[in-house]
Regions:
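Functionalized membrane-embedded alpha-helices
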Residues: 1-6
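HotDog/MaoC-like acyl-thioester-processing domains
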Residues: 7-106
């Protein structure tokens, strides 16, 4: 079986990072193991009913030692994501949408 644990691991104005941990368990032996981890980012947007609303997400208050460790590195991960986003934008400028089997001369 698997058990999925998630918690908000950082916020910045209108975005939040969520940490996901998947723990597997061998049902015959009861042995547990770390099956997967990941970070996902969500961006909050104003409601279409109230597009002018200005809001900011509340700060994260980690409780356990694990949460404190993971939350303490949020800003580093955020900066890495922003840098990677810029690198990806630059990289994608060199890619085409041509279909080689259609758009290439024979």
């Amino acid at each position: 079986s698997v058990c999925v644990e998630t918690f908000v691991s950082g916020v910045h104005h209108k975005s939040m990072e969520v940490f996901v941990k998947v723990v597997g368990e061998d049902l015959t032996t009861g042995e547990r193991y770390l099956a997967a981890t990941c970070f996902t980012t969500f961006v909050a947007i104003p409601s279409h009913m109230n597009p002018e609303s200005d809001f900011q997400l509340a700060a994260v208050v980690p409780e356990t030692a694990e949460e404190k460790l993971i939350c303490s590195n949020y800003e580093t991960r955020r900066q890495q994501r922003l840098a990677l986003r810029e690198e990806t934008k630059l990289f994608s400028q060199h890619l085409t949408t041509d279909l080689p089997w259609i758009d290439s001369p024979l």
